[in-house]
Amino acid sequence: MRNRIILIAISAACSLTWGADWPTDGANSQRTNFQPDEKILTKDNVKNLKILWKIKLDNVPQEMHSLFPPLIIEKVNTSAGVKQIALEAGISDNLYAIDVETGKLLWKKHFEYPTPERRGRPGDPLCPPGQTATPVIGPPNASGARNLYALAGDGKLHTINLADGEEVTPLFQFGYPNGKSYALNLWNNTIFTTTSQGCAGNPNQIWAVNLNDPLKKVMTFNPRSGGLWGRTGAAVDSSGTAWAPTGDGRYDPANQVYGNGLIGARVEGGELLLKDWYIPSNWIWLQKRDLDMQVTPAIFKYKDRELMVTGSKECRVYLLDTKSAGGDNHQMPLYRTPLLCNEEADFQSAGIWGSMATWEDSKGTRWALTPFWGEVHPAFKPPISYGPVKHGAVVAMKVEQNNGKVQLTPAWMSRDMDQAEPPVIANGVVYAYGNGENTRQAYADRGLADFSPLRIKASTHAVLYALDAETGKELYSSGDQITAFNHFSGLSVANGRVYIATFDSVLYCFGLPGH
């Protein structure tokens, strides 16, 4: 009897500690790309990663986009029992619920609507038609059900039961058709997204809607810039302020123009209002060289402050305070790194792209990580590195105080990666990948020629890596196992599995056999 009680207690403890969800792009509303609940994969066993399964989906790529990072919920009550579900979104207005244990499809949903009159120019990678925003999954309701929120290519927001794919509430308009929205963020029942590149003639702005509002009033703030194209949309701080990079453009605050910077907007009195902003002091030069700010920040607690890190194609990382992003003149960061890469000021194949990552280790050290594309800057020499970096890498920095000021201290730089993408940290391991994408947009003999068919043909394949989070040492490489590249996607990590999707609409699940 005593042994039985012990077994029951152990089982109960396991059921309480097992779950590690990934309900939104970037892991959480702060976009930290940190998985705090991973227990299965460790520094010691990650070298044994294998492809547990891969599934070819019927999603049709549009321009260079295909599948987005899957969302993972570990306990979903379905008609076939409790399932761990990977919710995969595809550019062609598709949602797929996949049984994580088997790699089999549980349900699929396709959003049907009349073809919009306006769309981007065919062949233009900047403006694909269809669903461009990673969905978001809300917390369980009183009955334990989970709703997911997805923004279709016609600009309508769908509320769907994760267990069966059925619509839960009437859909409503939350944007314009083919507006190129970015990853949805859910904070206190308010959904945020951003739009960019003026696709199909649509505005570039932050969008918000309160799901509790019976009228579903759509609130926006427009910085009048080239586009808010941070990979994971907006990051939301503890005050509910949504922070998003504004892309290329001018800075003229007297006329409410906030290009080449980072803005923070918050819902107040039924409106989305600008609360603060940061603009680099060299924004004019950044605009001239198309080295815009386009990196979703990662927000974190540090001592008694709430800070954030972001970056730009110039290849610098900026450390900012959410309470005063750029000081009194909005142009003074807490800290700005020297150039990590991009000595040649290349607008297309170098610099920091996408989003950041941050975590705190068991000793209380706060880390900030950034990916970059291209060759490392010759003057940047971190204390630990792993050979020449010609195509991209991940850099880890420690957030430290020095003489009363906060700074970013380089700790390590990873091995060379073919266009390094935003990393994920879980249980002392950094998961990163080179996307294998051909990012070239301009040529000496023909000038600007940014066409999807050219870039797709010249792309190779992605490679997944696992690194020691404290040293950057390579622990695992997928080598040639992944057979296609991906564009503007990302990683998800939960419950001993690492997920990556590719342009050919294949979702890969890596893990340890038997777990």
Model region roles, listed by residue range:
Residues 7-15:
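Bacterial N-terminal signal peptides
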Residues 39-64, 77-82, 93-129, 137-180, ...:
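Extracytoplasmic/lumenal domain signature
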Residues 68-74, 86-88, 96:
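General structural concept
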Residues 1-6:
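Bacterial N-terminal signal peptides that target proteins for export
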Residues 20-52, 71, 395:
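Blade/loop signatures of beta-propeller domains
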